[in-house]
Structures are given as structure tokens and as C-alpha cells.
UniProtKB/Swiss-Prot annotation:
Protein name per UniProt: HMG-Y-related protein A
Subcellular location field: Nucleus; Nucleus, Nucleolus
Ribonucleoprotein listed as a keyword: no
Entry keyword set: Acetylation, DNA-binding, Nucleus, Repeat
All residue ranges annotated as the H15 domain in the record: 22-91
Pfam families xref list: Linker_histone
Single GO MF annotation: DNA binding
GO cellular component, one term: nucleosome
Gene label: HMGA
Length: 204
């Protein structure tokens, strides 16, 4: 029994009919498309896809899905920037993107040491007596002569003088009750004035 060796199996025939995709990496094709288009405003996804289709003869059926995925990944990693739905290469001379909010102020070494010393001093319990209220007295100069107090007025100290205790000799006896009046009861008001008696001279 003879076999035809020139015919392969059905699976080999089917695999030979499938197109083989030997494509460069998508990030490489995307960067080449943006550089070739050279648009100062960037390129959108549709323009990049059309440029890749014009340069590559065979593309996989999921070409747009793969293109969207790689564009998103390149934007996250900073390889591309997106401005108004257009992709472009970042400017190498541009300053780094500033984050939100006010940047923290960098402390110098002296400020850091002072802050650390303040924290340590606050944790140590102070053994000094508590400071009284008010302004502390001004320190006296030992070279200055002592100032004498100037007494003005009568020299009497302020305030009410202390009450002096009474002695036995100064004790005043209580007045005796007035004797009961035996005469007529005195009426109210001022008593009438008594007129003086005029004595006639003798021999008139």
C-alpha cells in the first residue's frame, strides 16, 4: 500500500493558511507614528492607528484594543503626555510637574537642631519655683546709695489708727439715772421768758 508523501495532514494545511504577525512592539510603533506625524499639538488615537495601518501590512484583529492599552500604559509611565485627547512626547527641557498644594519648606540644620532642643526642654520637668504674677522687681544697683523715704504732710500713717485699750483710771463711770422730777410736768415747746421785776425808787 502506497502513501502520498507530498500531502501533509489537515492541521498542517490549516496552520499554514493563518497569517503570521511579526510586528514590532506597540510602544515602538506608537513613538514612530508620533515622530513621523510631528504635530505640535499632538496626535489622537485615530491618527496614530491610521499611521500604523499604513506602515504595517498585517495587523491583529484586536489592533485598536491593543493600541488603547499601550497608549494608556505609556501615559501612566510618563513616556507620553496627553493634552486635550492628543498624545505627545514630553518636553525634556520642561520642569517637573508640580504637585498640588504648597510645597513643604525645607528646614536648615540649625532650625532642625533648635526644634529638637525645644522638644527635649518641654519634656523635662522644671524644678524652678513657679513664677509669680506681675512684673518682676527691677534689680538694684549696689553702687547707688539707698534712697531715703520723703515723708510728706503730717507724717501720720494711712488708715485708721488702732484703738488704744482703756486703763482703769480712764474708765468713765456710767452716769447715775436722773432723779425723778417731783415738780409739775413740763409742757412741750420753749418756756415763756420771765420778765424782770421793776422796783420803783424810794421817795417818788
Amino acid at each position: 500500500m502506497a502513501f502520498d508523501l507530498h500531502h501533509g495532514s489537515a492541521s498542517d494545511t490549516h496552520s499554514s493558511e493563518l497569517p503570521s504577525f511579526s510586528l514590532p512592539p506597540y510602544p515602538q510603533m506608537i513613538m514612530e507614528a508620533i515622530e513621523s506625524l510631528n504635530d505640535k499639538n499632538g496626535c489622537n488615537k485615530t491618527t496614530i492607528a491610521k499611521h500604523i495601518e499604513s506602515t504595517q501590512q498585517t495587523l491583529p484583529p484586536s489592533h485598536m484594543t491593543l493600541l488603547s492599552y499601550h497608549l494608556n500604559q505609556m501615559k501612566k509611565t510618563g513616556q507620553l503626555i496627553m493634552v486635550k485627547n492628543n498624545y505627545m512626547k514630553p518636553d525634556p527641557d520642561a520642569p517637573p510637574k508640580r504637585g498640588r498644594g504648597r510645597p513643604p519648606k525645607q528646614k536648615t540644620q540649625a532650625e532642625s537642631d533648635a526644634a529638637a532642643a525645644a522638644v527635649v526642654a518641654a519634656t523635662v520637668v522644671s524644678t524652678d519655683p513657679p513664677r509669680s504674677r506681675g512684673r518682676p522687681p527691677k534689680p538694684k544697683d549696689p553702687s547707688e546709695p539707698p534712697q531715703e523715704k520723703v515723708i510728706t504732710g503730717s507724717g501720720r500713717p494711712r488708715g485708721r489708727p488702732p484703738k488704744r485699750p482703756r486703763t482703769d483710771s480712764e474708765t468713765v463711770a456710767a452716769p447715775e439715772p436722773a432723779a425723778q422730777a417731783t415738780g409739775e410736768r413740763r409742757g412741750r415747746g420753749r418756756p415763756p421768758k420771765v420778765k424782770p421785776t421793776v422796783v420803783a425808787p424810794v421817795g417818788c
